[in-house]
Each structure stands twice: as structure tokens, then as C-alpha cells.
């Protein structure tokens, strides 16, 4: 398994936006409103991109080991946003493996001393999507795991700047809203 760590906020936010902007065939999706909610209440600060061969039966344990090795502050962790991309023949993704990974992610803040009440409080949200990318080789899978953390005062001050950067990033994908209908649909004469 190959993996890459990203800590640049703008790069992580672009990766999250790409879940909605790509041409991948969406099999399990989240709403864009969910992404907006994550960004409103938390800040993307860390991401792991893992390229996996589905024939590797230990991939879940390998990802868990990578996550645990990152030394990220668990106490301010809010949520995970996970994008799973498989190739055309990659539908052999095991539900049991996916469940095991999701179970780890949602309980990452649990301790041995947790009571039932504190477990409910320490539960970590994990939103995920699954898409198919035909350009991926058979049996290949990519997991993009993005983490949001509590907003600091500095994060709040920088929010507007990052929002403007994302708006600029999205422009090529969407026509401007101030164009007349004839310019939006030039082939439609009526």
C-alpha cells in the first residue's frame, strides 16, 4: 500500500470539492450540504491518500496503522470525510472490511475507561462516499481520508480567504450565474 500525507488546508478542501466535481460514477454519495456543514463547524487540517490493491487482505490494518502513526491531536478531532474510489472491476470491495474501517474511525477517540455516556460523547462522525473511476486499473482502490478539527480563532479568521480560493477553484466547472440563458445554452435557439 502506498500512501501520501497532506496537511495543506487548501489542498484538502480541493480534494473534498473534487468528490462533487469529478466525472466518477457515484455509487454511494453524501450531499454537498454535508460538506458545507463540516467546513462550517470544523477545519480540514489533515488528509491521508492510500492507494490499495484489493487483493491485499490486510489493507484495513495497514490503513489503521498509518492513521495511528500520524500523531494527530485526537481531543480536537471532529469528523472524518472519506472518499473511496474503485476501478470498474473493483466492486469486490468487502463490506466487512469497509465496516471494520468505519468502526475504527468512529471509535478512534474511545478509551478503555469510557462509560456508555462518554462513548456517545467521544463518537467521531465519519461521512463517506464510494465512486467508480473507469481509468483505475482492475482491483485498484484509492481512499482519501480527510480530517476536520475544532476551529481555532486563526482558522475562523482565515475561513473567508479559503472560501474565496475554493470559489476560484470551482469556476471552471460551473458557468457564471450572470450569463443570459442564450449564452448558457447557445445551441438551443428557442
Where are these regions (language model features)?
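Tubulin/FtsZ superfamily GTPase core signature
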Residues: 1-190
Amino acid at each position: 500500500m502506498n500512501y501520501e500525507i497532506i496537511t495543506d488546508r487548501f489542498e484538502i478542501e480541493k480534494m473534498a470539492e473534487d468528490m462533487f466535481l469529478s466525472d466518477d460514477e457515484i455509487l454511494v454519495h453524501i450531499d454537498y450540504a454535508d460538506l458545507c456543514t463540516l467546513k462550517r463547524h470544523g477545519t480540514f487540517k489533515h488528509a491521508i491518500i492510500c492507494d490499495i490493491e484489493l487483493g491485499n487482505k490486510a489493507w484495513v490494518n495497514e490503513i489503521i496503522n498509518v492513521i495511528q502513526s500520524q500523531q494527530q491531536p485526537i481531543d480536537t478531532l471532529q469528523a472524518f470525510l472519506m472518499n473511496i474510489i474503485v476501478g470498474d472491476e473493483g466492486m469486490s470491495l468487502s463490506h466487512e472490511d469497509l465496516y471494520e474501517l468505519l468502526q475504527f474511525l468512529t471509535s478512534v477517540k474511545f478509551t478503555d475507561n469510557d462509560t456508555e455516556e462518554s462513548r456517545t460523547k467521544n463518537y467521531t462522525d465519519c461521512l463517506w462516499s464510494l465512486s467508480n473511476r473507469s481509468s483505475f486499473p482492475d482491483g485498484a482502490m484509492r481512499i482519501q481520508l480527510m480530517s476536520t478539527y475544532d476551529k481555532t480563532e486563526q482558522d475562523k479568521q482565515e475561513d473567508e480567504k479559503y472560501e474565496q480560493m475554493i470559489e476560484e477553484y470551482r469556476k471552471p466547472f460551473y458557468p457564471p450565474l450572470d450569463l443570459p440563458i442564450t449564452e448558457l445554452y447557445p445551441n438551443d435557439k428557442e
